[in-house]
A protein has these predicted regions:
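Ankyrin-repeat-protein effector appendages
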Residues: 1-9, 156-169, 175, 188, ...
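N-terminal segments that cap or nucleate solenoid repeat domains
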Residues: 1-41, 45, 181-194
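Ankyrin repeat boundary/linker residues
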Residues: 3, 36, 69-70, 103, ...
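Start-of-repeat signature of ankyrin repeats
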Residues: 6, 39, 72-73, 106, ...
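Ankyrin repeat A-helix N-terminal signature
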Residues: 12-17, 45-51, 79-85, 112-118, ...
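Ankyrin repeat structural motif
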Residues: 18-26, 52-59, 85-93, 118-126, ...
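Ankyrin-repeat inter-repeat connecting loop/turn
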Residues: 32, 65, 99, 132, ...
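Eukaryotic tandem repeat interaction scaffolds
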Residues: 366-369, 373-378, 382-385, 389-418, ...
Length: 493
């Protein structure tokens, strides 16, 4: 039924807090339940605005305290609670308001008050026997809403009133780092060892976030440090992976197994090494971590530290006895990995751990490549220098019989070619195709390298298996300067 002019006047008076007009209109017989086009009554407007005297007057004149607004299904009590109007709430409850009425979303006045964090309104509703464990259509309770809002006093009041802390609320509080709320939830019966949909416990979640105070609260409540998630991760491996030093220390102190492996065989020490977190690596080693443990790919903590280039972690691991010669499943050693990446400082540290006469270590191959040939190919001049000074054989051949010198010629690395020659590289060795370093230099048109090779006694007229000489290769590629240089040095047609 559309509102009359008199109804509209009453609604306007209630909206603006005009007590005199409200009294006058009611005295004329205007309906106390007057409502606008959306179904909002004068009582609802007065309640949400906090006009307590108008609320009292309307109720005294028969206004329906439980009238439901057409839009969203709200009541005056819900509106008053949502707008923190404690006096309105008190009057409405005294007037018989249904404290557990639900709106279209299944929310109650208590949920609205919990969302807004008004402890006074919450207490009024609880005293009126509001249901603390009812949930809305999303499955959210007043306690969950209060925890999400971060209002400690409201959470405590709900807990004291018997609210049950389902575990989703605990995970929510942990993710937000709300230590005080977490403590309350645990006291309300939340299980610190329950797993979420990702099979992680609250302790694991706190370890990922790195919140030490939350970790300490959970541990004090009996959180189990040894629980695994679906990937075999524990709170400790996760904390190490995310680099949270204080959390790792706390978990180790609580008895966490430092050598436990995840589904891939990874350990906390490997995670610390891969992340370059020296303090965590130190804590774990002091707690007895197996320094040479291997994952399913036969990677070790040292392998990870070398791969990522963390010099300080590599130094620590070497001092503590990490194996420098262990190969992973692909056949790589720490030396090979350091060489290909040009990690000169790490390479030096590795070389210091072995005797220069240890040819098996220095010249170890993977897919026919040595540390030297890999470093040469990548153009890491300083790395090549360190390797040569460390005793590697400059003449060990790699893939297809190519020596480090040949690779330097192919890639045009002049300084490296000079280093190799000065370190005793044989300029006349042949690869599987019968080619010499000079032939490769001629094929690439590397004038400066050719000069180095000639000065080192390179044989000018050797032929490869295709019966080509260095001069022929230069002529074929129209390298006029190279042709002239070779002929001047004595190369024959």
């Amino acid at each position: 039924m559309p509102a009359t002019k008199q109804d509209a006047l009453l609604i306007q008076a209630a909206k603006t807090g005009n007590i005199i007009h409200v009294q006058a209109l009611l005295a004329k017989g205007v309906n106390a339940d007057a409502k606008d086009s959306e179904g909002t009554t004068a009582l609802m407007f007065a309640a949400q605005k906090g006009y307590a005297e108008i609320v009292r007057i309307l109720l005294k004149n028969g206004a329906n305290v439980n009238q439901v607004r057409r839009r969203f299904g709200l009541t005056a009590l819900m509106l008053a609670a949502a707008h923190k109007q404690a006096d309105s709430v008190r009057l409405l409850l005294a007037g018989g308001a249904d404290v557990n009425a639900k709106n279209d979303d299944g929310s109650t006045a208590l949920m609205a008050a919990s969302l807004k964090g008004d402890i006074n309104v919450v207490r009024l509703l609880l005293t009126a026997s509001a249901d603390v464990n009812v949930c809305d259509r999303d499955g959210d309770s007043a306690l969950k809403i209060a925890a999400l809002s971060g209002n400690e006093s409201v959470v405590k009041a709900l807990g004291d009133a018997g609210a049950i802390a389902d575990n989703s609320i605990l995970f929510l509080a942990v993710s937000q780092g709300r230590a005080a709320i977490i403590r309350i939830l645990l006291n309300c019966g939340a299980d610190p060892n329950i797993k979420n949909a990702d099979s992680k416990t609250a302790l694991m979640q706190a370890a990922i976030v790195g919140n030490l105070s939350v970790i300490e609260i959970l541990l004090a409540a009996g959180a189990d440090v040894g629980i695994f998630d679906k990937d075999g991760e524990t709170a400790l491996t996760l904390a190490a992976d995310f680099g949270h030093v204080d959390v790792v220390l706390a978990l180790v102190g609580a008895g966490a197994d430092v050598n436990v492996k995840n589904r891939d065989g990874g350990t906390a020490l490997m995670a610390a090494a891969a992340g370059g977190t020296l303090p965590i690596a130190l804590i774990l080693l002091d707690a007895g971590a197996d320094i040479n443990a291997k994952d399913k790919d036969d990677e070790t903590a040292l392998n990870f530290a070398v791969l990522e280039g963390y010099e300080d972690v590599v130094e620590l691991l070497l001092k503590r006895g990490a194996s420098v010669g262990a190969r992973n499943r692909l056949g790589d050693t720490p030396l090979l990995v350091a060489a290909v990446h040009g990690y000169t400082t790490i390479l030096s540290a590795l070389l210091q751990k072995v005797n220069q006469n240890n040819a098996d270590f220095l010249n170890a191959k993977n897919f026919w490549e040595t540390a030297l040939t890999l470093a040469v190919f990548q153009g890491h001049t300083e790395t090549v220098k360190v390797l040569l000074e460390g005793g590697v054989d400059p003449n060990i051949a790699g893939e297809q019989g190519k020596t480090a010198l040949m690779k330097a010629c192919i890639r045009g690395h002049i300084a490296i070619a000079k280093l190799l020659v000065d370190s005793g590289a044989d300029v006349n060795l042949r690869d599987d195709s019968g080619a010499t370093a000079l032939m490769w230099a001629a094929h690439r048109g590397s004038v400066d390298i050719i000069k180095i090779l000639i000065d080192a006694g390179a044989e000018l007229n050797h032929k490869n298996l295709g019966n080509y000489t260095a001069l022929m290769l230069a002529e074929f590629n129209s390298y006029k300067e190279v042709v002239k240089l070779l002929k001047t040095a004595g190369a024959r047609e």
